[in-house]
Amino acid sequence: MDRVAEPELMLDAHQARAYASADFEEPHSRFIDLLKQRLIDLPPNGVALDLGCGPGDISFRFVRTFPQWSVDALDGSPAMLELGRRAAERSGLETRVRFHEASLPRDSAPSRSYDLIFSNSLLHHLRDPEVLWSSTRRWSRAATLVFVMDLIRPESRGRASDLVDRYAFSEPEILRTDFHNSLLAAYRPSEIRDQLREASLSHLEIEVVSDRHFIVWGPIPSVNQPDA
């Protein structure tokens, strides 16, 4: 099944609220667990960059798990960022998770480089996947750690519908439709390997971790270390 692109930004306020209220406990907890397991050299403190943060649930989970870290959380949707800022204030995390509106690759992050760059479910929204990988290189330095998790495009629309029924059976129809569209827009591991090679990031590991998710992870090498 060929990829079917979807809108890059979730700009509608109603859609953003529905997304923010959805039950992502299992995949978001899994994101943090996998990050902890794979990035065993993560230092005890630092500043992370969250690319495509949405309403911030991953960033909130990250700083609760790693209490000496803070996060600059970037997204291009004002509706998502407003929900994230409100949630940060309610939970007292507004000084540790800082939300910034930014459209990639045009805009800048608050810092020139970061100790960790992570992203959850941004890649499948991008018409040009190079945007994610070039942004990762742009804000990294030697030994910056990278962790990306996203969906895998299934082999058919029927399989996509099966995954929606299995994992979003109790969600509102707007979210079921979003999930289905996201599966159709996702990339496959072979495509991601090509993307990493073209971005000179093929030293990063790629791993399928469920029937619908992959992760990319590892450190950025020093500038004089050749890409694999």
Residue ranges with predicted function:
Residues 126-136:
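A short, conserved alpha-helix within the catalytic core of class I
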Residues 25-44:
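Conserved alpha-helix/loop element of class I SAM-dependent methyltransferases that forms part
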Residues 1-18:
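N-terminal, positively charged/glycine-rich alpha-helical extensions of SAM-dependent methyltransferases
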Residues 151-199, 205-207:
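C-terminal alpha-helical "lid/dimerization" subdomain adjacent to the S-adenosyl-L-methionine
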Residues 49, 57-106:
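Class I SAM-dependent methyltransferase SAM/SAH-binding core
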Residues 143-150:
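Conserved beta-strand signature within the Rossmann-like core of class I S-adenosyl-L-methionine
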Residues 118:
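A conserved beta-strand element that flanks and buttresses the S-adenosyl-L-methionine
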Residues 55, 185-228:
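Conserved Class I S-adenosyl-L-methionine
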